[in-house]
C-alpha cells in the first residue's frame, strides 16, 4: 500500500465535484455506490454511468480491497486513445463474475490511477482514496470521460428511434 502524506478527499466531496461537470448529470445510489449518471431530461430510469464512488467490496469485485478502513474507489472511463497511451491495449473481457488481467498493476495501492479490476476491458480506470492534488490532476480527464459517455448516449438514442 502506498504511504500517504496528504489526506484523502472525502468520497462525498468527490461525488459532488463530479456533478459539477455539466448539465444532465444526476447522482444515484446504484449497487451500493455513489454513481453519477448522464441522463439529460431524466428520460431514462438511470441514464449512462459517468463515474462511481464505491467504498466496499462487492461479491465479484474484491481485487482493490475496498473494505479497508477509509478506502474508497473513484472509477470512470477514459477515451480509447487516453487509455491506450497510459495502459496499452485494454485487457480482454473477463468471464462473468471474473476480474480482468491488468498485468503488474497493484490494484490496492492508494492514490494511483490503474486499470479498473473488473471494467478495464471497457477502458475504465480507478484511483483509490485520492488526495486533493490527485483529484486535481484527474480533472482534465473527467470532461473527456463525460464526452465518451455522451457519445455513447447519443448512439443509443439514435438506435432506439
Description of each model-found segment:
Residues 1-161:
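Charge-dense, helix-prone N-terminal extensions
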Amino acid at each position: 500500500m502506498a504511504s500517504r502524506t496528504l489526506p484523502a478527499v472525502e468520497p462525498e466531496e468527490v461525488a459532488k465535484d463530479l456533478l459539477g461537470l455539466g448539465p444532465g448529470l444526476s447522482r444515484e445510489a446504484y449497487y451500493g455506490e455513489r454513481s453519477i449518471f448522464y441522463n439529460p431530461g431524466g428520460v431514462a430510469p438511470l441514464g449512462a454511468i459517468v463515474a462511481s464512488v464505491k467504498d466496499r467490496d462487492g461479491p465479484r469485485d474484491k481485487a482493490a480491497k475496498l473494505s479497508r478502513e477509509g478506502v474508497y474507489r473513484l472509477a470512470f472511463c477514459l477515451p480509447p486513445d487516453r487509455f491506450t497511451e497510459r495502459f496499452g491495449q485494454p485487457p480482454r473481457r473477463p468471464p462473468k463474475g471474473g476480474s480482468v488481467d491488468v498485468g503488474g498493476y497493484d490494484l490496492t495501492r492508494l492514490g494511483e490511477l490503474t486499470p479498473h479490476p473488473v471494467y478495464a476491458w471497457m477502458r475504465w480506470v480507478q484511483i483509490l482514496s485520492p488526495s486533493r492534488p490527485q483529484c486535481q490532476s484527474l480533472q482534465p480527464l473527467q470532461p473527456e470521460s463525460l464526452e465518451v459517455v455522451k457519445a455513447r448516449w447519443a448512439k443509443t438514442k439514435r438506435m432506439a428511434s
